[in-house]
Amino acid sequence: MATVLSSTGKISQVIGAVVDVTFDGELPAILSALETDNNGNRLVLEVAQHLGENTVRTIAMDSTDGLTRGQPVTNTGAQISVPVGPKTLGRIMNVIGEPIDERGPVGAEQTAPIHAKAPEFIEQSTEAAILVTGIKVIDLLAPYARGGKIGLFGGAGVGKTVLIQELINNIAKGHGGVSVFAGVGERTREGNDLYHEFLDAGVIAKDADGNPTPDGSKVALVFGQMNEPPGARARVALSGLTMAEYFRDQEGQDVLFFVDNIFRFTQAGSEVSALLGRIPSAVGYQPTLATDMGQLQERITSTTKGSITSVQAIYVPADDLTDPAPATSFAHLDATTTLNRAISELGIYPAVDPLDSTSRVLTPAVVGQEHYETARRVQETLQKYKSLQDIIAILGMDELSEEDKLTVARARKIQRFLSQPFHVAEVFTGIPGKFVQVEDTVRSFKAVVDGEYDHLPEAAFYMVGGIDEAVEKAKKLAAEA
């Protein structure tokens, strides 16, 4: 009887997403999952603090509407665990691993706790190879490392989600391994669109009756979207990561892990932090910001067993890259793709800032001498143009030397040539999407900086694939003129 008493507690207070539970006997360990019934629904609470007075403070993984003081809470004696393995493929789950696609239980043979240790130092793998994305500006100037961590930084509405969807289209669809997509605090509509896109593309397989099935599917989706309470948004990235880790460690696969959006993970942590009674740090963020980010990011890594290549969209509040949330994530990434509002205002998409995006693998040893030199010459031309813009704005183009005029003309062509029609945006633009191989990208840009295409008009370079298409477009423009 004593064990039953000790494993059952009572709710003593409810403050939004934070619930205090009192136990008579032994207290549940920190990070333990507690369960209670909320109007017929299972509500999971995660222990965050021991307050003394036999009370633990917990974070709710779902809405606390309808909870009452004194109602019983059961200690499960374990952490929140989510289903892992092949049965998760083709399914949509929430933070606690429950299916939300209305297709019955997941039926996985195994579950795994969402909190785990990062791989040991000795288990880490450090080979450097390029992950081809087919997107010119990325492959040329800030290439992605296979098994690396990639961050897409950008303010509101500059194209992070479209870029991540294009990367899913270009990489995940042709990728032999498994992908996991974690939707953290973003729009439910986008999650729905993505699911149907996967169905249409065959990334999620269908059975004879046309219903989605795990057999032959290549992606698992975990969602804790904008409408979810902060507890769910703060943990859903870990749930998705746990599923990805299983495929890496148990099946030795090369896994693609997409997260949209890491900032919402931080934001949810800051919402909960104040309710937990922690004193906020800079800009009102939680004092544990660096720790929370480190614990998540250090688990996303490649080991000797398999690799996780992660692409993370990171919202930049008020376009300020020095804000603590994006600034904390910079240190963990191998490549950063920064989206710039000024470039999107010019109508150049993807609105990647070629001078602000970086990559660890842009070295001659990894990409080759020709690629490296071409990338640096492109950046040099764009940088010269940037420094001349003030002079042009005040005095006009006529005051520039002939050499500078040529630099400006080439830079403007390069700027337009870095734009590219996306497959996922085809429905909006009416322009068929383009996938450009790295060799074509390097060859095309080398020719442009060498001045081989100085005779082509600027407009010919806008929204095309390789240089051959720009030449075709120039002929077409000339014919129309």
UniProtKB/Swiss-Prot annotation:
Membrane topology: Peripheral membrane protein
Class of the enzyme per the UniProt entry, highest EC level: translocase
Classification via PROSITE patterns: ATPASE_ALPHA_BETA
Single Gene Ontology MF annotation: ATP binding
Family matches, as InterPro entries: AAA+_ATPase, ATP-synt_VA_C, ATP_synth_F1_bsu, ATPase_a/bsu_AS, ATPase_alpha/beta_chains, ATPase_F1/V1/A1_a/bsu_N, ATPase_F1/V1/A1_a/bsu_N_sf, ATPase_F1/V1/A1_a/bsu_nucl-bd
Function recorded in the entry: Produces ATP from ADP in the presence of a proton gradient across the membrane. The catalytic sites are hosted primarily by the beta subunits.
Gene3D superfamilies: 2.40.10.170, Bovine Mitochondrial F1-atpase, Atp Synthase Beta Chain, Chain D, domain 3, P-loop containing nucleotide triphosphate hydrolases
Sequence positions that bind ATP: G154, G155, A156, G157, V158, G159, K160, T161
Reactions the enzyme catalyzes: ATP + H2O + 4 H(+)(in) = ADP + phosphate + 5 H(+)(out)
Family, as annotated: Belongs to the ATPase alpha/beta chains family.
UniProt keywords, alphabetically: ATP synthesis, ATP-binding, Cell inner membrane, Cell membrane, CF(1), Hydrogen ion transport, Ion transport, Membrane, Nucleotide-binding, Translocase, Transport
SMART domains reported in the protein's UniProt record: AAA (SM00382)
Compartment annotation: Cell inner membrane
Pfam family, one: ATP-synt_ab_N
Name used for this protein in its record: ATP synthase subunit beta
EC number of the protein: 7.1.2.2
Upper classification of the organism: Bacteria, Pseudomonadati, Pseudomonadota, Alphaproteobacteria, Sphingomonadales
Domain of life: Bacteria
GO cellular component, one term: proton-transporting ATP synthase complex
